[in-house]
């Protein structure tokens, strides 16, 4: 393994951490409803737990309403049941053709709570970035121990990995701040 491979590993994994945090952020409720809220929901489709998005279309018809149109009408009851079991804070409204989810406007307490969740997701991502830094630094130490790089190269490599870490932690902080503002905006 060379230093370039260590750098590549570090960047790739830190970028994956950012992507994972973005996916997590998508499930958080903000002022307007997002279809990502129902992504984790699984519907019993002929005995197989299937993502809701694969048994029907999910559309945000306005800022507070999601409309779920199943591709098979016989799935309406199953979708309704799955939504109730998912405990996402709303009751499904089944009109025989589609299921509508009406999300009430969030209270300031709810907004603060969700903002806290966003902050926690950011902290989780920062821990992941720091763990990647540790793994990369361990790889650099091993290269030095195996006499594949000099002590000076090792020091520079550690500094470079720290620079990546600082950059990604700053990205995470910026994303959390932006998400908090989005959540708290009335």
From Swiss-Prot:
GO CC aspect terms: cytosol
Listed SUPFAM superfamilies: Ribosome recycling factor, RRF
Keywords of the record: Cytoplasm, Protein biosynthesis
Record localization: Cytoplasm
Function: Responsible for the release of ribosomes from messenger RNA at the termination of protein biosynthesis. May increase the efficiency of translation by recycling ribosomes from one round of translation to another.
Alphabetical list of HAMAP family matching this protein: RRF
Protein name listed in UniProt: Ribosome-recycling factor
Species, as recorded: Wolinella succinogenes (strain ATCC 29543 / DSM 1740 / CCUG 13145 / JCM 31913 / LMG 7466 / NCTC 11488 / FDC 602W) (Vibrio succinogenes)
């Amino acid at each position: 393994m060379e230093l370039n491979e260590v750098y590549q590993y570090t960047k790739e994994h830190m970028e994956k951490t950012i992507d994972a945090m973005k996916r997590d952020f998508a499930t958080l409720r903000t002022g307007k409803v997002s279809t990502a809220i129902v992504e984790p929901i699984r519907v019993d489709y002929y005995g197989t737990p299937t993502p809701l998005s694969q048994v029907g279309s999910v559309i945000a018809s306005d800022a507070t309403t999601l409309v779920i149109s199943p591709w098979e009408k016989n799935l309406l009851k199953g979708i309704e049941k799955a939504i109730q079991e998912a405990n996402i804070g709303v009751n499904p409204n089944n009109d025989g053709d589609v299921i509508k989810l009406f999300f009430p406007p969030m209270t300031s307490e709810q907004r603060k709570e969700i903002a806290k969740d966003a902050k926690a997701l950011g902290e989780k991502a920062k821990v992941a970035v720091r763990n990647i830094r540790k793994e990369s630094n361990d790889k650099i130490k091993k290269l030095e121990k195996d006499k594949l790089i000099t002590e000076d190269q090792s020091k520079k490599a550690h500094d470079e990995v720290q620079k990546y870490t600082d950059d990604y932690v700053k990205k995470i902080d910026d994303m959390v701040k932006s998400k908090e503002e989005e959540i708290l905006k009335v």
